[in-house]
Amino acid sequence: RCSRDWSSDVCSSDLIDYGFPESEYYHPQRTGGTLMCHHAHTSDPDPLVGIGEKDITAHVNFTGIALAGQDAGWEVLGYTSQGRFLYNCGLGEALARTGQASTANELRDRSALQKLVAEHEMGELFKVVGFVKGEWFDAIGFAHGDRSHTL
């Protein structure tokens, strides 16, 4: 969300990715780092096997992202899980209003939404950090379950 008025610039930005705060990112038990490769519903840590056949990914250091944002003049609005963020933004109420899924498409859509918020799926794996530049505002996505203190 960005707007411009006569006196100041106000912008906010949310970053959604999978990762950890620094204390978890550099945890002593994470000796192999966070690099992972994915292919055909399997994963492994070796990007040199099956070159060109796998997606290569790594988790992000959300503490580093927050510090970089602050160095650039942004303030952290909040940090939470994707599931909590979506529920704070009203996803639970929206699902309740739709009632029971009655068609295959509705069931598929509801299942996809559940995957976004379920703790054992993307809901906890993915995190959201919000930034603001300019005038501070209360961001509803971080109203409950803010974990900024862990950054």
Regions found by a protein language model. Give the residues of each.
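Rossmann-like AdoMet/SAM-dependent catalytic core
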Residues: 9-151
